[in-house]
Amino acid sequence: MRIGLVDVDGHHFPNLALMKLSAWHKAHGDSVEFADPMFGRYDRVYMSKVFTFTPDCSDVYRCEIVRAGTGYKDYTTVLPEEVEHITPDYSLYGVHEAYGFLTRGCVNRCPWCIVPHKEGSIRPASPIREFIGSQRRAVLLDNNVLASDFGLEQIEEIVRMGIAVDFNQGLDARRACDDSYILDLLARVKWIRHIRFACDTME
């Protein structure tokens, strides 16, 4: 199959779903590229959109089109298990960091946040070794990893592996300050640039 990918939000931040789809299709012998609306010829095109404020792609492709992502207000479509748990194709964006979720969901029910509606309560997603590949740095997209025993176990594993990480959604400052074990654990982590804390409130 000839597969085209469209990152509707642009290429400023790697789209994790597209990297996983690319890895899966390449593993099955398919050709994969970012879709070219003028010269490309495809059997299927995947369009992924994270942000609702991003205008939709208006390009015309005369093939099967799959649109998904929170940007389409699609909170039910998920990747098949065999795609969800594959090591992403980091060559798609030419990045030198791994990207992924250790956990999904959140224990909080902040009324302004889409995470509880989309992902539910916190649960394990993937161990770090599942998506790190050959990279020595990882950008982790968890929403509240410190609220998960599995998440804390994976941070311990990250320390043992000696890789540098960035929890780019921020770590819950309240949980860290209330638990000396968490503070000690975070002190042992190698950070890509700096540690990010978050303390979301309505104010």
Where are these regions (language model features)?
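Short, aromatic/basic amphipathic alpha-helical patches
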Residues: L18-S22, D56-R62, T77-L79, E153-I158, ...
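N-terminal [4Fe-4S]-dependent radical SAM core
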Residues: M1-R2, T54-P55, V66-T103, V107-R137
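Core AdoMet radical
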Residues: L5, G10, Y46-V50, I114-E203
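Generic, ordered loop/turn and secondary-structure boundary motif
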Residues: A17, V107, L146-A147
